[in-house]
Amino acid sequence: MKKIFLDANIILDIFNPSREYYNYSLKFYNFALLSKYKLFTSCDLITTIYYIDSKKDTKQALLNIQDINKTLKVIEFSNKEIEETCQLMILEPQYKDLEDTIQYIMAKKYECDLIISNDKNFISKDIELITSKEFCKRYIK
């Protein structure tokens, strides 16, 4: 396992101790960095993270984004991936959430081995999907 895609909720967790999965997400994140995994997220999640974090503290939200920018590869998507996302959602009705489906398409494009998300509704047909808690129990001794 070398490439891991992070959903927005994982990134939000690592910067906010009051979130339910903070400890697991932070433990996963630190382990992944030390283990030299390649971590990915998509560009649209950066604005989502800023929007949520800036409600509490704008400067800290920007510092968090700078940290993400240094430790994760932020990947872009374009018309092609949007079309793939729409087609997948039309053909396979279990894909209901546009943002999550774009993340799945981007994880596939970058050949990620794993998607980490604490969203119980996230769908991933052919990339392993686990929570930060499951990752910690499975891979961190």
Regions inferred by a protein language model and the residue ranges of each:
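Active-site neighborhoods of divalent-metal-dependent phosphate/nucleic-acid chemistry enzymes
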Residues: 73-120
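Active-site phosphate/pyrophosphate-handling residues
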Residues: 9, 44, 101-105
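Short, well-structured N-terminal submotif of metal-dependent ribonuclease cores
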Residues: 1-40, 54-63, 135-141
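General small-molecule cofactor/ligand-binding pocket signal
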Residues: 40, 75, 130
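Hydrophobic helix-cap positions at the C-terminus of alpha-helices
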Residues: 31-32, 68, 88
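Structured helix-beta-strand junction loops
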Residues: 34-36, 70-71, 125
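Acidic, PIN/NYN-like endoribonuclease modules and their adjacent C-terminal/linker elements
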Residues: 3, 109-141
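Active-site-proximal, substrate-binding regions of enzyme catalytic domains
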Residues: 26, 44-46, 50-74, 80-81
